[in-house]
Amino acid sequence: MTPLSMSGAGEAQIIKKIGGKEEVRSFLEKLGFVVGGEVTVISEIAGNMIVNVKGARVAIGKDMANKIMV
C-alpha cells in the first residue's frame, strides 16, 4: 500500500485503507472516498491533488491524500 499522494496523474487506483482520526475518515467518506472504491488522480500541483471519485472531481490537500492508502 502507498499513499494516494504518491500516485501519478491518470492512474486509477483502488482505495485499500483510510487513516487518520474518526472525523477525518468521516469527512473523506462523505466526499466519496471509501475502502474498495476507485479513485483517479487528475492532476497534482505542489502536493495538492484533483482527483475523480464516484464521478465527481474533488480537490484535496497533500495531508488528506497521505491518509488515503491505495
Regions found by a protein language model. Give the residues of each.
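Compact, glycine-rich, soluble single-domain proteins
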Residues: 1-35, 40-70
